[in-house]
Amino acid sequence: MALKVLLEQEKTFFTLLVLLGYLSCKVTCESGDCRQQEFRDRSGNCVPCNQCGPGMELSKECGFGYGEDAQCVTCRLHRFKEDWGFQKCKPCLDCAVVNRFQKANCSATSDAICGDCLPGFYRKTKLVGFQDMECVPCGDPPPPYEPHCASKVNLVKIASTASSPRDTALAAVICSALATVLLALLILCVIYCKRQFMEKKPSWSLRSQDIQYNGSELSCFDRPQLHEYAHRACCQCRRDSVQTCGPVRLLPSMCCEEACSPNPATLGCGVHSAASLQARNAGPAGEMVPTFFGSLTQSICGEFSDAWPLMQNPMGGDNISFCDSYPELTGEDIHSLNPELESSTSLDSNSSQDLVGGAVPVQSHSENFTAATDLSRYNNTLVESASTQDALTMRSQLDQESGAVIHPATQTSLQVRQRLGSL
């Protein structure tokens, strides 16, 4: 059984080989018998290809058994054919490419005819004596042996085409937009830089105004820092204290009057500083003084501030006008113009010196408090006697509330002050 199967497979394979050989032989015989310009017709015979006349060519390739249906057609554009034959049409010569004049145009039956070289070009001569078809530029300087390069060519300048109005308008719009954007950016940068500069810049003017107008609000312990300012600034302090300061701000204004006084070193503040309290406590009597008297100073200043509006002169504008009229006067000049002020000051100072050894700090506070009151009453020389009595009554009530004991020497000082008020 196996042998029979192998025999049948061999027969099938051999049959296929014979069939393939026959087909290949048939194809070879059909195409191989015809020559280059021959094609095989329907009967299987090789027939020569058709020849076309001038200006015509076959529509398809013909030869080696192919091109049975090829026909003659006219040459395509820019091509020509001068003779009969099997060849195809050739491309025409372009005289502009070779830099030469064109004498005749190209046609289907003839090629284009080129003339001499264009101005500024010449034809090179080969070694064998023939000239090239293409003309080359003369160059600078031109070769002397070429006649075509001897004369220069007059070139005509062609005017450039003017731009259209639409392009001009578009360019103007673009430039305007760019300029606007740049200007806006510049303005924003300036504003930003100015804000940054103002935020970082210290406000010296505001600080000076705060020192000038708010100086009366400082406590008496801070007044030594303000002695460096001039007499004119002190007058400004007195001028504005009545208008801008409330009842609480009127008590420290004595410090401003102290700066305006003829001799600031001798008068002092109505309430002593911490340094003066320590100096007095160093004496024999200071050893027995309780430590809470330091806080009593602030309470006296606070209680006296409530009563200070009652002691103000309703006609205090005269003193302000005096400062305004003579702002250039120094402390010594004002001292010389007011001899009564010297006597008042000397009386108060003598009375205070007599009480340094034997009086307690509470009595010294009342004494200095009386001296400051006398100074303010002298500056207001037109105070009526009724207002003086009211102020004295108010001061005595304040002293009683604070627990202070009025010393007999203090009463003497009060009598001196009453005499000055009656003047």
UniProtKB/Swiss-Prot annotation:
One of its GO terms (molecular function) is tumor necrosis factor receptor activity. Keywords: Apoptosis, Disulfide bond, Glycoprotein, Membrane, Receptor, Repeat, Signal, Transmembrane, Transmembrane helix. Highly expressed in prostate. Detected at lower levels in thymus, spleen, testis, uterus, small intestine, colon and peripheral blood leukocytes. GO terms for cellular component: membrane; plasma membrane. Residues 1-29 form the signal peptide. Residues 192-423 are cytoplasmic. Disulfide bonds join C34-C46, C49-C62, C52-C72, C75-C89, C92-C106, C95-C114, C117-C135, C138-C149. The chain crosses the membrane at residues 171-191. It is found in: Membrane. One of its GO terms (biological process) is hair follicle development. Glycans are attached at N105. CDD domains: TNFRSF19 (cd13418). The keyword RNA-binding does not apply. Gene3D superfamilies: Tumor Necrosis Factor Receptor, subunit A, domain 2. TNFR-Cys repeats lie at residues 33-72, 74-114, 116-149. Associates with TRAF1, TRAF2, TRAF3 and TRAF5. Interacts with LINGO1. Can mediate activation of JNK and NF-kappa-B. May promote caspase-independent cell death. This is Tumor necrosis factor receptor superfamily member 19. The gene is TNFRSF19.
